[in-house]
UniProtKB/Swiss-Prot annotation:
Pfam families: DHFR_1 (PF00186). Key enzyme in folate metabolism. Catalyzes an essential reaction for de novo glycine and purine synthesis, and for DNA precursor synthesis. Pathway: Cofactor biosynthesis; tetrahydrofolate biosynthesis; 5,6,7,8-tetrahydrofolate from 7,8-dihydrofolate: step 1/1. Substrate binds at I5, D27, R52, R57, T113. The keyword Oxidoreductase applies. This is Dihydrofolate reductase. The gene is folA. It comes from Citrobacter freundii.
Length: 159
């Protein structure tokens, strides 16, 4: 199964200048909980923004340019990334925008954090047809001392 996991603000903004324009430790914990012990697939820009392999996960980076860091597996295409995951029950696609766009048609599940924030962004989550997805989990949280904005965790499964 292919799943996408993303945090998105109003207008589907997911990033600005290779970073997330908000501070939500709760979302980082949600991300870790849902990706741990699963292969994670990302584009080169996402890899560069993280700067290190995510522990407890097989890290696969899609890039047209050969990678030099042997702590991750470098592939050139979506199909190579899927093949690199072998028979893993769930592949977690973690970004960025172009990689989400390439995997969305193949995805069976979306793990989304909807952030109640209007922020400038240069990277967006792809537009998806809501009627194609069923919400199977939703959990709202108000902003607090640690989390800069209100947010809602949601899991969608393809109908």
């Amino acid at each position: 199964m292919i799943s996408l996991i993303a945090a998105l603000a109003v207008d589907r903004v997911i990033g600005m200048e290779n970073a997330m324009p908000w501070n939500l430790p709760a979302d980082l914990a949600w991300f870790k909980r849902n990706t741990l012990n699963k292969p994670v697939v990302m584009g080169r820009h996402t890899w560069e923004s993280i700067g290190r392999p995510l522990p407890g996960r097989k890290n696969i980076v899609i890039s047209s340019k050969p990678g030099t860091d042997d702590r991750v597996q470098w592939v050139k295409s979506v199909d190579e990334a899927i093949a690199a995951c072998g028979d893993e029950p769930e592949i977690m696609v973690i970004g960025g925008g172009r990689v989400y766009e390439q995997f969305l048609p193949k995805a069976q599940k979306l793990y989304l954090t909807h952030i109640d924030a209007e922020v400038e962004g240069d990277t967006h989550f792809p537009d998806y047809e809501p009627d194609d997805w069923e919400s199977v989990f939703s959990e709202f949280h108000d902003a607090d001392a640690q989390n800069s904005h209100s947010y809602c965790f949601e899991i969608l499964e393809r109908r």
